[in-house]
C-alpha cells in the first residue's frame, strides 16, 4: 500500500530500495480518498530501526495509510537525536483531539521495572485511556502488550528464570480467524523478553480470545472479539539481524547472554541468522490493517466513541 510519511524520514530511502511505495502529500491528495490514519507510539530505543521495521510491514495492502509517530514527553531518549524526535514525532497534546483508525504500541526495554516505576507510566496510562475513545483498533507489542493488559485487566507480568530469546513455533488456535487468514496451522516468530504473563490470569480476568500459543513462549497473541484490542508478545516486525544485534550488545556489555534459540545455524554466531517469519509477519500486519482497521472502523471517526460506549470500553 502507499504509506504517507514525511519524505525526509530516514526510513524512506531504505523502503524505496526495497521497492516499497512511499507517497508524498501532493500525490496522495490526487487520489481523493480518505486514508486510514495510523498512530505509532514508538517506545523502542533504536527508534529509526523500529520505524523502518513497522513501515515495511504496513506497506502490504492497496490501502492508503497516513502515519504519525508519537513519543513520550515525560521521557528523554538516550539513543535517538532530539532533532529526529522534534522533526518526525508528535506529542500526546498534539494528537489528543484527533481520531485514528489504528494504533501500534511497541515494546520497550523496561520490563525489569514494576509498571508504576517506569518514568513515563502516568503519560502512558493517559494515552491508553484516551485510545478507548479516539482509536478504533490498537495493536500492542511485547512490553506494550503486557502494559496494556495490566492497565485494562490487572493481568500481571512475571520474571522468567532466563531471557526468552530466539525463533519459536506457535500454533494458531482459531481456524479461520481474520487475524490469521492465510496462516498455516503453525508458524514461527522471534521472541525477546525477560517476563511473561499467566494464561490462567488471562482466562480468569479477561474476555479476550487466545489466538496463538507455543510450548516455549506460552500465550503469544490474543485479542478482543471485535479486534479493537490486540496483544502480541512476540516480535513479528523484527529484521533478520535484530536478535543477533541484541545478543552481541549484551555479550559485549558482559552479561553472558544465551545464544538465541533456533536462530544461528548450529548455534554458530558467525553464521548468518535465519529469516523464517517474514511471510507470517506480512500476513499478520496486512490482516490487522484490512480486517481489524479498514473493514471495521467507522467512516466518521467521531463514532469511535459511540462504539466504545456500546462495547463497554467506557
From Swiss-Prot:
The record marks 192 as: Important for substrate specificity. CDD domains: GATase1_HTS (cd03131). It is found in: Cytoplasm. The record marks 111 as: Important for acyl-CoA specificity. GO terms for biological process: L-methionine biosynthetic process from homoserine via O-succinyl-L-homoserine and cystathionine. GO terms for molecular function: homoserine O-acetyltransferase activity; homoserine O-succinyltransferase activity. Keywords: Acyltransferase, Amino-acid biosynthesis, Cytoplasm, Methionine biosynthesis, Transferase. One of its GO terms (cellular component) is cytoplasm. Substrate binds at residues 163, 192, 249. Coiled coil: none annotated. Transfers an acetyl group from acetyl-CoA to L-homoserine, forming acetyl-L-homoserine. This is Homoserine O-acetyltransferase. It comes from Streptococcus pneumoniae serotype 2 (strain D39 / NCTC 7466). The lineage of its organism: Bacteria, Bacillati, Bacillota, Bacilli, Lactobacillales. The gene is metAA.
Amino acid at each position: 500500500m502507499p504509506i504517507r510519511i514525511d519524505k525526509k524520514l530516514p526510513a524512506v530511502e531504505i523502503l524505496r530500495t526495497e521497492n516499497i511505495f512511499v507517497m508524498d502529500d501532493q500525490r496522495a491528495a490526487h487520489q481523493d480518498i480518505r486514508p486510514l490514519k495510523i498512530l505509532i507510539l514508538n517506545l523502542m530505543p533504536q527508534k529509526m530501526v523500529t520505524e523502518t521495521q513497522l513501515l515495511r510491514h504496513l506497506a502490504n495492502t492497496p490501502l492508503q495509510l497516513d502515519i504519525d509517530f508519537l513519543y513520550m514527553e515525560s521521557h528523554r531518549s538516550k539513543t535517538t537525536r532530539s532533532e529526529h524526535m522534534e522533526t518526525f514525532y508528535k506529542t500526546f497534546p498534539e494528537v489528543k483531539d484527533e481520531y485514528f483508525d489504528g494504533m501500534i504500541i511497541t515494546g520497550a526495554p523496561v520490563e525489569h521495572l514494576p509498571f508504576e516505576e517506569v518514568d513515563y507510566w502516568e503519560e502512558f496510562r493517559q494515552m491508553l485511556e484516551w485510545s478507548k475513545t479516539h482509536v478504533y483498533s490498537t495493536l500492542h507489542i511485547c512490553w506494550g502488550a503486557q502494559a496494556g493488559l495490566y492497565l485494562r485487566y490487572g493481568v500481571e507480568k512475571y520474571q522468567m528464570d532466563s531471557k526468552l530469546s530466539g525463533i519459536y513455533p506457535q500454533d494458531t488456535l482459531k481456524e479461520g480467524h481474520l487475524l490469521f487468514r492465510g496462516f498455516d496451522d503453525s508458524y514461527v516468530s522471534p521472541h525477546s523478553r525477560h517476563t511473561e504473563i499467566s494464561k490462567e490470569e488471562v482466562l480468569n480476568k479477561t474476555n479476550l480470545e487466545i489466538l496463538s500459543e507455543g510450548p516455549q513462549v506460552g500465550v503469544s497473541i490474543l485479542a478482543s472479539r471485535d479486534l479493537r484490542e490486540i496483544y502480541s508478545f512476540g516480535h513479528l516486525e523484527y529484521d533478520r539481524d535484530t536478535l543477533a544485534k541484541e545478543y552481541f550488545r549484551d555479550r559485549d556489555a558482559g552479561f553472558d547472554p544465551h545464544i538465541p534459540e533456533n536462530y544461528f545455524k548450529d548455534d554458530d554466531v558467525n553464521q548468518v541468522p535465519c529469516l523464517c517469519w517474514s511471510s507470517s509477519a506480512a500476513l499478520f500486519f496486512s490482516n490487522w490493517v484490512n480486517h481489524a482497521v479498514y473493514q471495521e472502523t467507522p467512516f466518521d471517526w467521531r463514532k469511535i466513541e459511540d462504539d466504545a460506549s456500546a462495547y463497554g470500553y467506557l
